Amino acid sequence: MTNPLLTPFELPPFSKILPEHVVPAVTKALNDCRENVERVVAQGAPYTWENLCQPLAEVDDVLGRIFSPVSHLNSVKNSPELREAYEQTLPLLSEYSTWVGQHEGLYKAYRDLRDGDHYATLNTAQKKAVDNALRDFELSGIGLPKEKQQRYGEIATRLSELGNQYSNNVLDATMGWTKLVTDEAELAGMPESALAAAKAQAEAKELEGYLLTLDIPSYLPVMTYCDNQALREEMYRAYSTRASDQGPNAGKWDNSKVMEEILALRHELAQLLGFENYAFKSLATKMAENPQQVLDFLTDLAKRARPQGEKELAQLRAFAKAEFGVDELQPWDIAYYSEKQKQHLYSISDEQLRPYFPENKAVNGLFEVVKRIYGITAKERKDVDVWHPDVRFFELYDENNELRGSFYLDLYARENKRGGAWMDDCVGQMRKADGSLQKPVAYLTCNFNRPVNGKPALFTHDEVITLFHEFGHGLHHMLTRIETAGVSGISGVPWDAVELPSQFMENWCWEPEALAFISGHYETGEPLPKELLDKMLAAKNYQAALFILRQLEFGLFDFRLHAEFRPDQGAKILETLAEIKKLVAVVPSPSWGRFPHAFSHIFAGGYAAGYYSYLWADVLAADAFSRFEEEGIFNRETGQSFLDNILSRGGSEEPMDLFKRFRGREPQLDAMLEHYGIKG
């Protein structure tokens, strides 16, 4: 039986990959990697790019190309068999990574290269790749005594297992709660689109009625529109206690102990490497210089946003009392009455906009924006092997008709697919030893409603923004001009700069000039009418301060959790959250809420002591976009400058240098505050 993962491929043969292929393929790739490292080191000095970095990059690339589709399938097409195979590979990968990071001979080879004459002949990207490699050796404990190195390896392996366990618990808990509603009266107030989706969910399970789930496209409409307060409360409880010791499935997929162990091990790891705590370690590879700078940034932002947030909530309470006689707003009432107030103030609702954002309009509109700014054209290919019939595949070409990169687009929520939206790399750009250039490939994944009742998929404006956001990451990866592995595309980009291209792209979703072709009624093709557009723009900053305060709550919680960890006191997760809420939250939340238990970004993603990156990059993105506002949002020269200075440079230079080259100065906070309508 041939193993499709071990047969050379341009693009992953998704339909042929079975769980039993995973462990043998990864094991073989890891053995090849180890042999290669030993062979490269054994040849002795003088080490050059060609005899050291290039061969290692190529064999690493093979490993990445084998593991990337496996890891991706684990996220979008999870099954018990695949999950088990994936779990078996995690310790193998972690052990290999530690082995490389603590390989004395390899470390010495890199140091010889950096200290020798050859280093001066390398280009900027190659120098950066060598410098990063040396930094990563330090961060893998290369300088530690043997027993500490061994402990580092044990911690790293355990952390990768715990992150995976956390993620599985969240997925299982999300899928582990559903509610069948047979009486439509219980769903009064719900938009037709949500009812149709819930009905389709039930039919797929051969049930009569409406099936509600904790997936966002099912959960949000209930919280926002359903008149039935008891149902809102029931769903809110189920959602905000996922994977915890509370709620309807209390204790079943509980992440409490998992989080505590993760935080304790991260702290121990940081201290092994000589850092005071994990926040310091996290910043060793980021733009921000030290924890105090991050805390000052977040605290300053909170001071500016809080008074406005309090005002927004007071107005909502007054509105709910005056119009609906509600004396006390419960947490499950906030979204519901906010929507009512938004309609009252601006006579507009998300649902009114939905018919104007059918999938084909939104996707093609996105491509049109990219064409106007960067001269890049997207072309669909139908002959590519995908993991689900709904997945589409596109290639990007520039004005010289050169293929720059390609991507998979997987837009709809499904069972066994993890929630949220994300971009990931499938293949990175790299110049190979034989002179050929391997082009980048990306995965773009969202969780939107699928088409129902013969209508196309209709998106909310928020979903269109999400699509643009993820595509911004995609462009960063696919339009790279860097040909050095490790610093091309999104590789090697500091985490607090990685959200710049994505948040930057969101701006076009608010521009009348762009909305003229991003929108079009699914029946008539008519673009968003001016009257609706004006209302949408007027409502743009509705509750903007509350939104920022929520982001600050997440960012401060994450950062302080890591910066203030004390082994003798344990993690103090709920206590820390309560303290942060006192500082920044204005909306009350119940004591049984268990937000941290499903905060995958920091416990199972790359945002540990790094969630602040969203707000940090928001400052960069708003300021970068303000140049477009000055020079024209479809100004090709401005677009080219952003492409040349930021998007195409990958991780080859420091983000601040790249930003200054584009903007002509350091970033300023004003543009972001103005963007959210917050008085500085």
From Swiss-Prot:
One of its GO terms (cellular component) is cytosol. InterPro entries: M3A_DCP (IPR034005), MetalloPept_cat_dom_sf (IPR024079), Neurolysin/TOP_dom2 (IPR024077), Neurolysin/TOP_N (IPR024080), OpdA_N (IPR045666), Pept_M3A_M3B (IPR045090), Pept_M3A_M3B_dom (IPR001567). Gene3D superfamilies: Collagenase (Catalytic Domain), Endopeptidase. Chain P, domain 1, Neurolysin, domain 3. SUPFAM superfamilies: Metalloproteases ('zincins'), catalytic domain (SSF55486). GO terms for biological process: DNA replication; peptide metabolic process; proteolysis; signal peptide processing. Zn(2+) binds at residues 469, 473, 476. Its cofactor is Zn(2+). Binds 1 zinc ion. Keywords: Hydrolase, Metal-binding, Metalloprotease, Protease, Zinc. The keyword Membrane does not apply. It comes from the Bacteria. One of its GO terms (molecular function) is metalloendopeptidase activity. Its EC number is 3.4.24.70. It catalyses: Hydrolysis of oligopeptides, with broad specificity. Gly or Ala commonly occur as P1 or P1' residues, but more distant residues are also important, as is shown by the fact that Z-Gly-Pro-Gly-|-Gly-Pro-Ala is cleaved, but not Z-(Gly)(5). May play a specific role in the degradation of signal peptides after they are released from precursor forms of secreted proteins. Can cleave N-acetyl-L-Ala(4). PANTHER family: PROTEASE M3 THIMET OLIGOPEPTIDASE-RELATED (PTHR11804), SACCHAROLYSIN (PTHR11804:SF84). Belongs to the peptidase M3 family. NCBIfam families: PRK10911.1 (NF008159). This is Oligopeptidase A.
